[in-house]
A protein has these predicted regions:
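PIN/NYN-family metal-dependent endoribonuclease catalytic core
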Residues: 14-48, 52-56, 70-71
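Amphipathic alpha-helical segments within well-ordered protein domains
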Residues: 36-40, 62, 81-84, 97
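Active-site neighborhoods of divalent-metal-dependent phosphate/nucleic-acid chemistry enzymes
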Residues: 68-106, 110-113
């Protein structure tokens, strides 16, 4: 089965050393920037990693994303905006919901608010929900 992974679930897979579950699954093109921002915060704001670790992780994430099906949503901003409005979620989050709905696969996220809000449109799961199937 295929899935759409949001940035929270990809980061969680990285932390759990389970990036294997990401291969050949879907995400949106903005994920690269969301993950870069998460890692930047880990170094600059939280001081959990060094600058050398940050650069190494950015390179590793690039290789991970290269194994995923990263889709652009540039043609569908109006539909994404409508989802964001109707579910009262961010445009970023709505892009993942849009993709999951469009290709008819579950959305994998660690965001509890998104799990609840997206349920009317798509099936939502966490990484833990699917980890046993890999």
């Amino acid at each position: 089965m295929s899935y759409v992974f949001d940035s929270s679930s990809i980061f969680h897979a990285l932390k759990r050393r389970r990036v294997d579950v990401l291969a050949d699954n879907y995400t949106v093109s903005l994920t690269r920037y969301e993950l870069g921002n998460i890692l930047w915060k880990e170094e600059v704001l939280h001081k959990r990693i060094t600058s050398v670790e940050l650069e190494r992780l950015i390179g590793f994430l690039k290789r991970v994303l290269d194994k995923m099906k990263v889709l652009k949503i540039e043609c569908c901003e109006t539909e994404v905006l409508n989802i964001a409005r109707s579910l009262e979620i961010s445009f970023y989050d709505a892009s993942y919901v849009f993709l999951a709905k469009k290709i008819r696969v579950p959305l994998i996220t660690e965001d509890l608010k998104l799990i609840q809000r997206a349920k009317p449109l798509v099936d939502t799961l966490t990484l833990n929900d699917i980890i046993g199937s890999f």
